[in-house]
């Protein structure tokens, strides 16, 4: 499991952790470029490169397709059939990998349904703007391709004993190097890649991208202690020169024992552990682990504490409320865009709010907040049976618990930004974009 998304999967310990969040995002001024594309039913994250946004969409017949969209206009450039072969439902629907190969030139790499013999799918690379096929590679099983700097990384044969991670040239498909085992890319630039090795004893590792030379290794258990199990899910983000990781708890169905969990930070230049927050669970929606994580501590008896917002750079508490301040049940978390207020949203009923800096109760009146549009999401069917689409946020008036009539764009801590563009899915699956940022920022989904 990987990036759980919606309430059974995304709220990593759902029942006791029912949580949500929000923002005071204002309606965008007219001078910000903005668009909507209702031709797609977005079910994956969106990747961006060379002025193109690529995503996985679900067609009306339940089949998946890879769609490329012009980032400036929101217009669909092309669409081709897509599939998954061996990806785990808790990881969410696979997004295409988008790699920029030159200014305004890029490659979109995705899994095509074409089968041949023992191969269950075909990895296919296409020109980002035209959809022209560049190369293919047969696939038995994989969690899907990822961009790693200027290359494509993918773990293949994931269902077999000879699983390995491969690094490919995006223009030719030539294998540059490989290593045994299954890994996920957590960060890369043009020279280095940092991966999470998915194993019984997971390890964060760094390599030189051009030749695979190992740079450093750091076992996750060195940060959090023994008993880590990735089955509960995980998430990573980058704050400056630090990689911040979150490992979720997993309760074994037979033994009832809960695995080790918490957050930690690693220096990317040498792999040294920077800070650790053991035994905290991340709540949803909230910011990327490296930017504005919101967590709840859990004691040895499994009792939840209050809520705390952490500084992703240092791990320090920036604001918190105690367990005794948490109001009963039936609420969803809500935050303004600055995340300085912690709100408890009740649908169609008055909510409550706390000033995070002081921990004191504050007025809910006038607070517009964002929460999951759907609190009981249904899994996708057909080609993505058991999977959930990425979540959508809706804006609510915290004082009444009702939706607002003119919501703006969801907050940046949720959407993130890619080259200044913020992209998000509405509850019907349409993709929206606005260029109101100036840089690239990680969002809730990375």
Which positions does each model-derived feature cover?
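Secretory-pathway ectodomains
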Residues: 2, 10-14, 20-446
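A motif-centric signal for short, conserved binding hotspots located
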Residues: 7
């Amino acid at each position: 499991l990987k990036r759980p998304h919606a309430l059974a999967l995304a709220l990593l310990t759902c029942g006791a952790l029912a949580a949500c969040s929000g923002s005071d995002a204002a309606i965008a001024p007219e001078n910000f470029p903005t668009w909507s594309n209702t031709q797609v039913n977005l079910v994956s994250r969106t990747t961006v490169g060379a002025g193109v946004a690529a995503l996985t969409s679900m067609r009306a017949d339940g089949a998946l397709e890879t769609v490329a969209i012009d980032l400036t206009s929101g217009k669909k450039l092309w669409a081709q059939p897509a599939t998954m072969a061996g990806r785990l439902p808790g990881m969410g629907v696979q997004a295409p990998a988008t790699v920029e190969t030159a200014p305004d030139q890029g490659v979109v790499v995705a899994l095509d349904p074409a089968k041949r013999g023992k191969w269950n799918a075909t990895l296919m690379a296409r020109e980002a703007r035209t959809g022209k096929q560049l190369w293919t590679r047969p696939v038995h099983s994989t969690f899907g391709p990822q961009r790693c700097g200027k290359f494509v990384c993918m773990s293949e044969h994931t269902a077999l004993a000879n699983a390995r991670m491969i690094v490919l040239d995006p223009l030719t498909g030539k294998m540059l190097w490989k290593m045994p085992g299954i890994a996920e890319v957590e960060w890369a630039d043009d020279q280095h890649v940092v991966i999470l090795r998915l194993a019984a004893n997971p390890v964060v590792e760094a390599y030189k991208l051009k030749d695979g030379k190992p740079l450093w290794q750091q076992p996750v258990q060195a940060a959090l202690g023994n008993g880590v199990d990735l089955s509960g899910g995980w998430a990573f983000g980058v704050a400056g020169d630090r990689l911040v990781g979150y490992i979720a708890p997993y309760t074994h169905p037979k033994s009832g024992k809960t695995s080790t969990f918490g957050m930690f930070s690693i220096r990317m230049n040498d792999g040294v552990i920077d800070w650790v927050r053991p035994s905290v669970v991340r709540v949803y929606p909230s910011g990327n682990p490296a930017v504005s994580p919101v967590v709840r501590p859990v004691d040895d008896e499994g009792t939840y504490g209050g809520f705390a917002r952490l500084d992703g750079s240092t791990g320090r508490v920036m604001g918190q409320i105690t367990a005794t301040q948490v109001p009963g049940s039936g609420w969803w978390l809500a935050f303004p865009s600055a995340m300085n207020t912690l709100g408890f949203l009740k649908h169609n009923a008055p909510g409550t709010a706390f000033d995070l800096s002081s921990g004191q109760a504050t007025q809910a009146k006038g607070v517009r907040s964002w929460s999951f549009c759907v609190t009981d999401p249904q899994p996708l069917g057909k080609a993505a049976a058991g999977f959930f689409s990425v979540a959508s946020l809706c804006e609510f008036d915290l004082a009444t618990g009702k939706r607002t009539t003119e919501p703006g764009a969801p907050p940046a801590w949720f959407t993130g930004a890619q080259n200044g563009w913020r992209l998000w899915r509405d509850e019907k699956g349409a993709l929206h974009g606005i260029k109101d940022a100036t840089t690239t920022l990680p969002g809730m989904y990375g």
